[in-house]
Amino acid sequence: MKQSKVNVSFEFFPPKNEEAISSLWQNINRLEPLKPRFISVTYGAGGSTRENTHNLVKQIKKKTDLQPAAHLTCINSTKKEIELIANDYWSSGIRHIVALRGDPPKNISSAKGDFKYATDLISFLRKKYDFEITVSAYPEIHPDSDSIEQEYDILKKKIDLGATKAITQFFFDVEYYFKFIDGAVKRGIKIPIIPGILPVTNCKRTIEFAKKMNCKMPIKLKNMF
């Protein structure tokens, strides 16, 4: 029986120092033979981290045969700032953006800039560029959402504005993913929804992150830590 090919992508944090840069490129070179569908690079809140993201995405495009996807958050950003970044990516041959809101201040109404939600960013990008736009999805409901129905409504709005695929928040129980996919199909959502998988390298940090993002960790798994 012929096995179907499983396509994967990898997500990296931008390196913060020379040692991390060396380690990152070792990993990229090690993973390149697997021919991932794309390599994405996260986007931090600080200015220096953002520059690291921009530089790394462009270096991946220049030095490898991999297809990089640049995370781009919009909270506290102006249209001019986003336009400059998008223009730079486009002129560098980058054609894939992971469009996200980013972590807002505690009071979302106090956020500065021209964007409050990822949908604002998607709309802005789609009107000006022909990027492939990937967005987030939340099988276990985003901490700011009221219900799973709201999650589907937001995802459908992202698609209507130009999103071409989605990546889910990480999860530990695959049933949440399957249930989310079933619900998406019933609601006419047809874009690919890629499962987010988090390698556990730091148990304490993983548990804290899971709690923050409303990801339920099975007791059996938690006891292993």
PLM feature segments, named:
Residues 7-23, 68-80, 132-150, 225:
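Active-site mouth loops of central-metabolism enzymes
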Residues 6-14, 37-41, 68-72, 97-99, ...:
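Hydrophobic faces of well-ordered beta-strands that scaffold small-molecule active sites
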Residues 19, 113, 117-138, 188-225:
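Active-site pocket-lining/capping segments in soluble small-molecule metabolic enzymes
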Residues 20-21, 47-59, 78-84, 103-125, ...:
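Active-site-adjacent beta->alpha loops and helix N-cap segments on the catalytic face
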Residues 144-166, 176:
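Active-site glycine-rich loop that binds ribose-phosphate moieties when present
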Residues 1-41:
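Conserved N-terminal beta1-alpha1 strand-loop-helix module at the mouth
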Residues 12-16, 43-47, 72-76, 101-105, ...:
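Active-site-proximal loop/turn and secondary-structure-junction residues that shape catalytic pockets
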